[in-house]
């Protein structure tokens, strides 16, 4: 049981265990500074068996039989949840892995060997033969995909099909597993009686059911209906011997109903227990004991009418409402994890709530409310909280309800700086496309200026760039110049538009050159976009949205013929592709060509896997260490990249390395350098340093490669370069040594040339 206080731990036969009695008191009795916990051994090997049933009720009926087989986990989901996922395009391919049925159990077994785990699963398959469709998964990748389907439950149920918001309030009730089938049937009847609809899923092995229901919490009538429903639901769960909360706790939303479950005498005992620890009742008042009413002190409440300011982004996924977007966060705190995944890199360094996705979303909510935050778009607490946001978009991909702080940050900064000058680095880094075009006319002079000791330091100060940060060198010949000087493949071949982004055009042209070679090997005629076009990705980091929209409008206007023909656009830089797939349609939600371009834009690996039919990926039997760009993982998805590497025969380890810490321009800023390197040192940089010389290090993001090069002394390859390497069937040269030698010679020549020019100018001045 999770509801109430576990006073049974104070009984003599339980050893009067105070620590265990405090578990679940929700901060109402004491503040826990540290705790010693017991850990259960994790099985070395696992197997996943998925059982399909005609409906979720019959799946629940079989829980006792399933649990007798000794699984280490048993999760359930219904057809409503799967339909919600398909509607919202959440793991649409992964849901196809489910066996036939309209209700499913995901049953996991463990063992010291794979054979032992599989044997347990097969024994259960034999027991349920004929009663359920079943599928045993032996592929770890497929197993991971199915667990992601289950984990996406909250995100898939946060909105109904018509956009109506759903709420917690009756989200984790639990009953004894033997009673689960009966409870679910009667709970569905209760939902129907009140006119509510929701998916049913959760930890069925423990009898815990998760729901999010479309309560109307903004009108008096809706709130009264909510109260009646929750009261009836509490009676139902108690009648089945269950608990109001099986996982999340009571808080305010259920505590008023605890007498229904425990009786008045035990509830008074809860009060006495709290009084011993907290005689002044200052610890989290209004929760668990002597609680607020379930229908008061609501986050929204009757009469809730949030302001709807004019915004650049349309927020189409939130009914075109920034206010609704700021209500996405439901407070679970997934963004406060410290180890796995990417979200949230700045929080992992500072450990401050305001730097978590949850903290930032709540501050924006309070800013719009004007209570308690004042100042609107000029609210300094919001600016401070967003300042360390790396705009990695990990929250959009990993947050269960897809809070998108990167977009909120860009919107906020556009208003915060309206009519005001931005910091120096905003102009240095945000306008990098313009500076790069200028520098490409005289790359030698630009490189000398940015790397000559005294001059480089002065220029970095002017641009707000950290003096410790190494600045990438401009290529002596841009990719565009190289491309325009060569003959393309026969015009009869299928045409693709390779997006020559700022970074791979002006700094790393070898990446784009490799992509051309690979695409032509796959049988495509390659073209590139007109020179003036740039997606404007760096502009978002500084809220330069007027300029960003202008850049995207140019793209739509210039590419309309290509869009109309359905020409695929292939990108190399994940953040640029993400701009087309994400920001563009939020800035131009009613432009049909923007929607078409979103569907026609691919990352190179996606295009080769999905569109290069009949092409066989070149083999390269090597080991590889792979770091995924944040936008690649959160917006685009990393499956295609992994599939391409698999087809190549690479023994590739995809690192759970989080964010590299560079995050575009973030790591270049003077004030952000230390936190940038701290983020990189958490996982990525140590692994990169330890990477054996014969193992390929792969990173598609330009900023990721820059961070690894400076922080680990290794030069990663883009997947395009790895493909070209495979095509040429030879080992890569040593990029670091070759580039340094070339740069030393070039630098010496440039220095001599500039010195000659300077001396000549001095002589002319004197003779004049």
Regions found by a protein language model. Give the residues of each.
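Iron-sulfur cluster-binding cysteine motifs and their immediate structural context
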Residues: 285-287, 328-366, 394-413, 701-703, ...
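Short coil/turn segments at secondary-structure boundaries
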Residues: 77, 136-139, 158-162, 247-249, ...
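Short beta-alpha connecting loops at secondary-structure transitions
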Residues: 45-49, 168-170, 217-222, 252-261, ...
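Noncatalytic alpha-helical scaffold of FAD-dependent oxidoreductases
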Residues: 1-202, 207-246, 250-339, 345-346
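Repeat-solenoid scaffold signature
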Residues: 255-263, 272, 276, 386-420
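Glycine- and acidic
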Residues: 43-49, 102-110, 164-175, 210-218, ...
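Non-catalytic terminal/interface segments that mediate subunit docking, oligomerization
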Residues: 120-122, 134-137, 144-200, 221-234, ...
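Iron-sulfur cluster-binding electron-transfer modules in prokaryotic oxidoreductases
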Residues: 278, 285, 406-768
